[in-house]
Every structure is written in structure tokens, then in C-alpha cells.
Amino acid sequence: MSKVIGIDLGTTNSCVSVFERGESKVIPNKEGKNTTPSVVAFTDKGEILVGDVAKRQAVTNPEKTIYSIKRIMGLMSNEKNAEEAKARLPYHVVDRNGACAVEIAGKVYTPQEISAKILIKLKEDAEAYLGESVTDAVITVPAYFNDSQRKATKEAGTIAGLNVLRIINEPTAAALAYGLDKKEAEKILVYDLGGGTFDVTVLETGDNIVEVLATGGNAFLGGDDFDNKIIDWLVSEFKNETGIDLKGDIMALQRLKEAAENAKKELSSAQETEINLPFITADATGPKHLVKKLTRAKFEGMIDSLVGETITKINEVIKDAGLSKSDIKEVVMVGGSTRVPLVQEEVKKAFGKELNKSVNPDEVVAIGAAIQGAVIKGDVKDVLLLDVTPLSLGIETLGGVMTKIIEKGTTIPTKKSQVFSTAEDNQNAVTIMVLQGEREFARDNKSLGNFNLEGIPAAPRGVPQIEVEFDIDANGILTVSAKDKATGKAQNITISGSSGLSEDEINSMVKDAELHKEEDKKRKDAVEARNQADALVHQTEKSMSELGEKVPAEDRSNIEAALNDLKEVLKDENSSKEQIDAKVEALSKASHKLAEAMYKKDENAGANGGNKKDDDVIDAEVE
């Protein structure tokens, strides 16, 4: 039976894990690291780079290097967070069928397609490590991701060639990894602050049960926002000193982002750091350099309100769970941004107790996802995972009111229905507007989609009975149906979310990903062939030089001709493996005479060595 991989598809970094021989372990990538930067780059040569290699060239290729794609996953173009993303990100965020996408060199890519490229790398790294093909996966999402974002994540997995067995919440996965071996029931709080998202979840673990009691968060709050505070400060300081606004310089902004991220990390252990960016820009007076000292106290002042938001959310979630802080036995810290000292101090102060930092914040979510995969496959027995829906779901009713059908915090999977009627006499159709959120009016909540139920028999208003049913699966993905109870006519919709991708489009993207895989393999094969050819050229030239006149003129001429042919092919960067191999074979054949000459040279050297008179040897007998 093929193995199931657990994937933490993060905003900043991603991680993949597998459950084998009774434990879940992180799979290192081909570069030997346990996490892979969630960065995808498109080069001028048509190459697609993923991970560390993509991140390294970001400064010189800012408009075609995509990072933090998770922040626009399932995001509508008219949402507030979309406007902020467009203003912040150096690459082009554009509208595609009402949803956010990115434009690179004139081509539009959905967040699902970009995320799929990250997933493909994780899949290939897992296959290289395990030595077998991998298809099945469990992928994690922030607990506060809405239906659109969950659906988009699952679509990314499909495009990457994965069979997504389950979408599970990141804090739940972390709790699964942390609490699986706990025998006694205990209530824990998982504080998960990553690169772009924040979740807080209260769970009860013990005796192989992990039950979510309440969850909350902010899908647009994380380490990126800490970085942005530093960037804004640097831009402001530099403008005050030089009069130059760096916000219009994409390459400078990319350098500022890298510097801000590094400064944030350094301030986790140091009280002060220096940000030194020579030649950040230039004006008529010459080049300009940016050199600033940033203290931990200054940085903490910048992010204090953001950290404060997370503490407020902790209080709300504990209240939703019907608990008090004294009921929480452990506070488990998850996500790379929990390394920031102020975060740890404020959470510790909120509970008045030491925090549990026993889990690796970058790896624990993927480890939990792999455990969930093993549960689904039956490799781990008797484990029950009870998750909840993070936001209420309902429909728009008369007066623009949101009528909730499934309340937030309901354990999933679940199915609930409610009967509604018409608002006007002789109304023969109704439009069902599906909403997600906690506000009283429809306009203030997120619209997930709509559909029509037609053919309702003419009747006075309030007489027809229309049953609306909401069905949430274990992935937290919603299907809505409406049925006229008098006629039995029904209509349903699986909410496709704001991704706007049809099944045909997803299938097309799957094929496109496969095509790129073939192209990448051809390119890799060509690189390997080129390296071998370069080595042959070097060796042949070296041998020709060493043998000199010992190579007959005709043979030398043939070898030089084949050598020049191979060099010409190598000059063309678009040469295929087959073209290079053909010229390598021709040079190898022509070089046979070289091998013969080298052999004769070695033979003669050996013979001369054997005939050397032993002038320094004295014959003697040893008693």
C-alpha cells in the first residue's frame, strides 16, 4: 500500500512528513533541509524554480518571484485584503473572474497553480526520500480559512497530481502530534502564529481522542506583517533622510523585505541589529546607502498592536469553549513567528504560566498531518479526530438578513436543514445566496456563491415550503441543496468558492503541470548531458596537449573537427540532450585513437622503468 504524506503548505515555508514504522517523521528536501521556502520563480530562460533556489534570486527578479501566495488563496479581488496584497507585493496581483491571481510575463496564474508548484516539489522530495511513487496526501490549512480558501487548497493538491485524502486544520494537526500519546484527558490551547496566518484553538486530548472545542483567528495576520512594520519604518526613515521614496522601487523593496526578515530573526536572540543595504538606490548626487540600527524595544513597539490582537482572540476562543484560562493545562506554541520574544512574553503573561515549546514550531503541523494520513489509511488505530467549523454558515433572507443554518464551532462532518418560503405571491423561483461569517446582515459576511431553484408552483407568499440543507464534509468543504417539498424539485451546489475554477480548468491545469514536469525533466537531462560533454571536452583537450605529435595528423584532424562540433552544440543553450549526446558519441569515436596513443605511452613508460639499471642496489646475503 502506498504511503500517505502529510503536508504543511505554509505562507513562508512548507514541510512534508510521512508515518512509517510507528512514528511520523519529517522528510528532508533534496537540499537536505526539513523545510522548503514557499517561493516560486519564473526565469527569463523559461525555467520554474521552487524553494531555496527561487528565494536566492528574488532580489534580481522581484516581479517574477512569487512568495506568500497563501495570502491571496481563495481571495476575491474586491476584498480589503486583496487591495493590501496588491499594494505590498512586488509581483502583479490581478483579477481573474472576480478572484485574485498573479500575472507573470503576460500570463495569468491562479494561486492554486502557484501553490501546486510548491506541492509538486514536496511530492518529488518525498518520492526521492521514500524511493517510491506518492499520490495520497493530507494537507493542512489555517483553522480560520473559509470555504473558498479550503477549496482552493484542495484544488492546488489536485493540480499537483495529489489525491487529497483530507484537508485538516493546522492547530488540530499540531494537537494530534502533541497529544496522541496522552493517556489522561487534558484541555490544551494551540497558539499558531505563522508567516501569514494566525489561529488559536482550544482542544481536549487524551485516550486517543482529539476534540476541538473552539477555534478562531485571522487569516491575514502573521510574520509577514511583522516584516512589513520594519519595511514601513525603513522606507519612512530613508525618505526623511534623503527625500527618496523607495516604495516605487520594486528591487529596493525586495531587498528591504529580505533585510526586514533577517532583522526580525536576529532580534529573537539579540537586543540590537544593524540593517546595512549599500547602493539601495541612486539620484543625481550619486548612489545612496541605507544603514540603520534597530533595537528589540523599537521592533516590539512596532508590532505591539498586532500581538495584542492575538491575545484578544485567545480570550474570545476560551470564552467560546465555555472555559476559563485556569482550565487550560498546556499552551502549545506553533508556527515560526512564535519565536519572537514579545509573542512568547505576552502569551505567557496572559496565562501566568510557562509555555509548552516542546514541539518544533516549523515541523509539528506536517507531523500531525502525516498521523492523520495514517489514521485514514488504518495504520494508526482507534484515533478519533473531532474538528469544528470556524465560521457560521447560512443564507440571505428577507431584508438582507443572514440566517444561520450551521453555527460556528459545530463538529464536522455535519448536515443541517431549515425550511424557508417565498417572499412574494406567485413567486416561481428563489435565489439561494450562501454566506459565511458572524455578522447579522448578508452584506457584511463573505458570499460563497449562489444558485436558483426554479419551477415553484404559483401560490400565495409564505405557502411554498423550500428546504435548504447544508452539508459540510470532513475537509470543511460545503455542499448546499434546496428542495421544493411540494414538487420534489431540487437543486444543489458544491461551493466552488471564489477560486472560480471549473472542473475543466482544473483538469487543464493538471495536464499543464504534467507538461511542465516533462519539460523540467528534459531540461534536467540536457543539463546533465551538457556537464558530461564539458568534462569530455576538457579531457580530450588535455590529452591532445599531453600527447602532442604522438597523435597522427589525420586522427588529430578528425578529433579536432568532432571537438569543434561538440563545442558549437554546447554554445547553444537550447540544445537538447539528444543533440548533445550525438556529438559526444562522435567525439568519443574519433577519440579512440587518443586512447590507443595514451596506452602506448603508458606501456613505453612501464617498459623503460623495467629496463632501468639498478646502480644503487648492493647485492648481499643476510644472515
Curated annotation (Swiss-Prot):
Q: Which organism is it from?
A: Campylobacter concisus (strain 13826)
Q: Which Pfam families match?
A: HSP70 (PF00012)
Q: Name one GO molecular function term.
A: ATP binding
Function comment:
Acts as a chaperone.
> So which domain of life are we looking at?
Bacteria
Entry's family note: Belongs to the heat shock protein 70 family.
Tell me the keywords, alphabetical order. ATP-binding, Chaperone, Nucleotide-binding, Phosphoprotein, Stress response
Q: Which PANTHER family match?
A: HEAT SHOCK PROTEIN 70KDA
Name listed for the protein in its UniProt record: Chaperone protein DnaK
Q: Which residues carry this modification: Phosphothreonine?
A: 197
Q: What induces it?
A: By stress conditions e.g. heat shock.
Q: Which HAMAP family match?
A: DnaK
| Region annotation Disordered: where it falls in the sequence | 600-623
Q: Which InterPro entries match?
A: ATPase_NBD, Chaperone_DnaK, Heat_shock_70_CS, HSP70_C_sf, HSP70_peptide-bd_sf, Hsp_70_fam
